[in-house]
Amino acid sequence: MSAPFHDFGHAEILDAEAIGQPGARRFRIFVRSPRGAASLWVERDQLETLMAAIEKVLAQTSGVMTLRAEAQANPTPPPGAPDDFPSDPDVEFQVGPMQLGYDEDDEELLLRATPLELIEEDGELYARDSDEPTFSVFFSRSQAQQFCSSVNSLTLLGRPRCPFCGGPMQGRHFCEKQNGFHPPNLN
């Protein structure tokens, strides 16, 4: 049986926030539309990939390349979810694959998200992508630009990334590409 599909129509609010301290943060995309509120929980890499895809779509559809500041002395965190955003949204799930589309006629972007399903086999818990997207929302170009700005600020406030392997640098950082050493996998 497939999960219900949640078509949120046009977003009134679409943004991202990080909850917790760097190294132990959770990221979410929060959406509010006339059809309800949604919290889509994502990994940092998913958020960065979505930001890059949105920026690419915006650049390709405007004919103008938008440059983003990569470094700021003291980046300010985005405001996060508004105070009146429900603590128990209508839709909430951990996101697996996402799809990004663009409606040329209305000049809007479309985000579709598929949840991860937790499956237990032989006493082990596994995450598996669902077969079909179960969430969609349209958002404007200006909302897309604001979303990318928020994601950029969030990632700048987190742990720095290794320029060689892209992994988070905190404490002892083992980088196979930098020094040829990778700690043994003891699991």
Regions found by a protein language model. Give the residues of each.
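Positively charged, low-complexity terminal tracts
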Residues: M1-N187
